Design a protein with these regions (language model features):
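Short catalytic/ligand-binding loop motif for oxyanion handling, primarily in non-cytosolic enzymes
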Residues: 53-56, 102-103, 139
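Glycine-rich anion-binding loop/nest that anchors nucleotide
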Residues: 125-138, 155-160
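Histidine/lysine/aspartate-rich catalytic loop segments that bind and position anionic ligands
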Residues: 87-119
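Active-site acidic carboxylates
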Residues: 1-97, 126, 148, 152-155, ...
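Immediate post-signal peptide segment of exported/extracytoplasmic ligand-binding proteins
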Residues: 120-124
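Short, well-ordered alpha-helical scaffold segments within catalytic/effector domains
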Residues: 29, 113-117, 140
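A generic secondary-structure micro-motif detector
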Residues: 71, 106, 132, 161-162
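Histidine-anchored nucleotide/phosphate-binding helix
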Residues: 35, 137-148
Length: 189
């Protein structure tokens, strides 16, 4: 039974100093790197927000529900992985949100066009651990889609950072209801 780690959106714009920063993001990047060095995974993949022109997803007066400040624009430093995240062991990167809003890594594609679900299945993965930023948005969406696709899914909350307590609590309820295993406590801004 293959096991994979999905590292969600550990990008400069989602860490301290970024345009849509989540408190604790840089520490999460470093902790994920240490976790990966500890081994135990058959595969490690990463997702990233990689916007070209996502339409109404960007706004100068965002509502922080459907619209957001400009972030993770393709080719910019903000879209790059945080320097504390060691990506040398990452086998594939799944980019999402080029021309529309996208929260789940399962909405993205690798450079060769492969979807995350197909990539994992082709390698015999049956169990996934999900980590990254933000617990209450893209980590939640990715874990829910992993479970819906039939993967035994666990979120390592100690390797996530969330935006706000109310939305993190709501996300955790949704994840529990979907049968996602939750391990630890997230950092919450």
């Amino acid at each position: 039974m293959g096991r994979a780690l999905i590292v969600v959106d550990v990008q400069n714009d989602f860490c301290e100093g970024g345009s849509l920063a989540v408190a604790g993001g840089a520490a999460v990047a470093s902790a994920i790197s240490a976790h990966v060095r500890g081994g135990g995974y058959d595969h490690v993949v990463a997702t990233r927000d990689y916007h070209v022109d996502p339409g109404g997803h960007f706004s100068e007066s965002p509502d922080y529900v459907d619209s957001w400040p400009v972030h993770c624009v393709a080719g910019t430093a903000g879209a790059s992985f945080h320097p504390e995240l060691d990506v040398t062991g990452v086998e594939a990167v799944f980019s999402k949100g080029a021309y529309e809003a996208a929260y789940s890594g399962f909405e993205g594609a690798a450079g060769d066009g492969a979807s995350l679900v197909d990539w994992l299945r082709e390698r015999g993965v049956e169990r996934v651990d999900v980590v990254g930023i933000a617990t209450d948005h893209c980590v939640r969406a990715t874990a829910l889609d992993a479970a819906a696709a039939g993967f035994a899914t666990r979120v390592l909350l100690g390797l996530t950072a969330g935006v706000a307590r109310p939305t993190v609590d709501s996300a955790l309820e949704q994840l529990r209801a979907a049968g996602v295993e939750l391990d630890g406590e997230p950092a919450v801004g």
